[in-house]
Amino acid sequence: YYANNEGDVLRGAQTINGDELYFDESGKQVKGEFVNNPDGTTSYYDAITGVKLVDTSLVVDGQTFNVDAKGVVTKAHTPGFYTTGDNNWFYADSYGRNVTGAQVINGQHLYFDANGRQVKGGFVTNTDGSRSFYHWNTGDKLVSTFFATGHDRWYYADDRGNVVTGAQVINGQKLFFDTDGKQVKGAFATNANGSRSYYHWNTGNKLVSTFFTSGDNNWYYADAKGEVVVGEQTINGQHLYFDQTGKQVKGATATNPDGSISYYDVHTGEKAINRWVKIPSGQWVYFNAQGKGYVSN
């Protein structure tokens, strides 16, 4: 029991020395019992201290109960998955609430949208701006693996499950992924230094030290760093020229810094030296030992 300064025995809910306690109609302190509150909720008071429980769970007569921050007791639900049909899956926690966001359940890294629906076969944007992809069947976050979303669109999830972007070295291959994470294949990518590289149409590997074509008989050359060359180049002993897009010049002229022109063979792309050539304008021009020719106005 507890008596106040006037000697009155206290009853009902009381706060004494910072502890929330409860005394029944006779004034006896309640311990190890449920109490019905005036607002229709229920609270529970500790069996030893008599203090109202908050932010915890308890088991009484084999039943599990949850206690919130205000001390309101509710019967615990059994956590588990459930479906509403149409392959929509949810997970209810011990309070019976649908979980949302990133969750680790039974060792699986899963994700549930704002409505609680489990994400399967879809991308999710993480808090740091990166993206992750969740398996079509299990819903598990993909980690350290390539995956495709159809239409030959390939991606790679790193060891944290983040979909990579930009230049990457994976299993010894030099690959590139666009800003959405889609792997670049059979296309150019712009490097940080402004140069361009080309990635193989099947493997996605960056082409290095090789000629290649992008179709329509347009030829390019990737140097030892995998950068597409531009301007005048000597490759395998041949004097060649590539325009500012990297396309090899064939059957056409290029203007030199001193105002002279050079001509590059229509078949081999080799610079014309010590010979006459009828250039595309119809004029005949002689190209000297340096491969330079001059056109009269």
Please place each PLM-identified region on the residue numbering:
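Extracellular adhesion/carbohydrate-binding repeat motifs centered on closely spaced tryptophans
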Residues: 1-297
